[in-house]
Swiss-Prot record:
The keyword DNA-binding applies. The methyltransferase is composed of M and S polypeptides. Keywords: DNA-binding, Restriction system. Disulfide bonds: none annotated. Induction: Detected at low levels after 6 and 96 hours growth, there are fewer copies at 96 hours (at protein level). InterPro entries: Restrct_endonuc_typeI_TRD, Restrct_endonuc_typeI_TRD_sf, Type-I_RE_S_subunit. GO terms for biological process: DNA restriction-modification system. Pfam families: Methylase_S. Contains two DNA recognition domains, each specifying recognition of one of the two defined components of the target sequence. The specificity (S) subunit of a type I methyltransferase (MTase); this subunit dictates DNA sequence specificity. The single R subunit has multiple frameshifts and is probably not expressed. It comes from Mycoplasma pneumoniae (strain ATCC 29342 / M129 / Subtype 1). This is Putative type I specificity subunit S.MpnORF615P. The lineage of its organism: Bacteria, Bacillati, Mycoplasmatota, Mycoplasmoidales, Mycoplasmoidaceae. One of its GO terms (molecular function) is DNA binding. The keyword Acyltransferase does not apply.
């Protein structure tokens, strides 16, 4: 094996470029590791603060909990068919949320407004079971379910955090296309502390989530910048190789 490796011939760009490429690749590794660590850290604290036993440790051993199914505390709806062509032909300010999970689930923006206020959406197909908290004017595609809290004992933000943990557990993998239907969502059972405690926990998690998202959003931007730097050096190397090849021809 050592003999084979010894015979391998490698071409190297100038040392300065080697060092720059190595530095960029090291940065990729570090940024990717930090991205994973931030997401793990957030998930750990979210799960800890939403655990019933931990809530009692923090707020008192005698804190009561009430258990409800989603259908008992929410109006459950589904979005409508909104095509990309419709979005192109009806541009506006109101987002259309779909089964996408990138860009906050936003497919585009139109003039229409099907929902206005505090809601929860979830993806019903594809990347099913991904939950988002919404507050404002928006629309939802047919691959997006919509919840509106109707019980005054429930904090919408708190419910959204609970569902981010629980909803993925109820996703059905049918013919390699995961689904979380309205019917299944309606039957999910959740336990809630008093409203005042829900609001305190939701405020903590919302602030922490925003902080983590701000940090996480900055990391891909840094990675993209490093990719552009790497592309620059690759182009520089290959243009020189092409130049030398022409001279040798």
């Amino acid at each position: 094996m050592q003999g084979i490796l010894a015979e391998i011939e490698l071409d190297f760009p100038p040392l300065q470029i080697q060092e720059k490429i190595a530095t960029i690749l090291d940065t990729f590794t570090e940024l990717s590791a930090e991205l994973r660590e931030r997401k793990k850290q957030y998930a750990f604290y979210r799960d800890y603060l939403l655990n019933q036993e931990n809530i009692r440790k923090i707020y008192g051993a005698n804190i009561p909990f009430e258990t409800f199914q989603v259908k008992d505390i929410c109006e459950i709806r589904r979005g409508r068919a909104i095509t990309k062509a419709y979005i192109r032909n009806n541009p506006g300010e109101n987002p259309v949320y779909s089964a996408a999970t990138t860009n906050d689930g936003e497919l585009g923006r139109i003039k229409d407004c099907d929902f206005d206020g505090e809601y929860i959406t979830w993806t019903t197909n594809g990347y099913a079971g991904v939950v988002f908290y919404r507050n404002g004017k928006f629309n939802a595609s047919q691959d997006c379910g919509v919840l509106k809290v109707k019980n005054k004992k429930i904090c919408t933000k708190f419910l959204s955090f609970l569902l981010k943990i629980e909803a993925p557990k109820f996703v059905h993998n049918l013919a390699s296309r995961p689904k979380l239907s309205q019917k299944v969502m309606a039957e999910i059972e959740l336990s809630f502390p008093p409203l005042e405690i829900q609001e305190k926990i939701a405020d903590i998690l919302f602030a922490f989530e925003k902080l983590c998202n701000d940090l996480v959003e900055g990391i891909p931007a840094e990675i993209e910048m490093r990719k552009k730097q790497l592309d620059y050096y690759y182009h520089l190397i290959f243009s020189k190789i092409a130049h030398f090849s022409k001279q040798l021809a």
